[in-house]
Amino acid sequence: MLAHLAFQTLVLVVDGSVVGRGCVALMLHVVYKGRALPVAWLVRSGKQGHCPADLHLALVEQVHDLLPAGARVVLLGDGEFDGTRLQAAIQGYHWSDVVRTGRHGTVTWDGEHFRCETIGACIKPGTLVALREAHVTRDAYGPVLLLCCWAKDYHEPLYLLTHMADADEACRLYAKRLRIETFFSDQKSRGFHLHRSHVSDPVRLSRLLIAAC
């Protein structure tokens, strides 16, 4: 399937969710015809929360090895996936990415140092601000394109990091990240209720996901 879809840009979405009893599944999906289709996952013991960066890297590497050489890829992720190690790995694969980052994130741009929320405090709903050649975190990782997107009818702006050149395209693609939330709802409250399974072994849960997906 991936080889067939790779004739066009592959939009991948990564996220984690509680499964079974005391386990979390980190999953990577491909967006196809409005749905998020699971491609690969890793299950670990642990409570709901951010997975270790090493697990992020392992999953992305696993999917990279499945793709045909030269595939055009955009990876989407929420604030869990704004780590610089993951961004560097994605760059090494020659993929594009659009990931959310927190409002308290440190930014260096045009010789100035400030937090992401400083941008949001200066704009109104319906505004998109793009800071090119920005560096983020205290380690000044970059350059990246930092976006502050405040959609109309929303209470606060969204802060995104990307290596894409087109700010509007990056925002449009990031909206597809929500497709993975629909998948998790289908597997939980509207479907297999994986979060209520009493299975606590990561290996068994990984196999169960094969059947559920």
Where are these regions (language model features)?
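Single, function-defining residue in the core of a domain
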Residues: 5-10, 21-23, 32-213
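Nucleic-acid-interacting cores, centered on viral/eukaryotic replication and modification enzymes
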Residues: 29
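Aromatic- and Gly/Pro-rich donor/ligand-binding loops
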Residues: 13
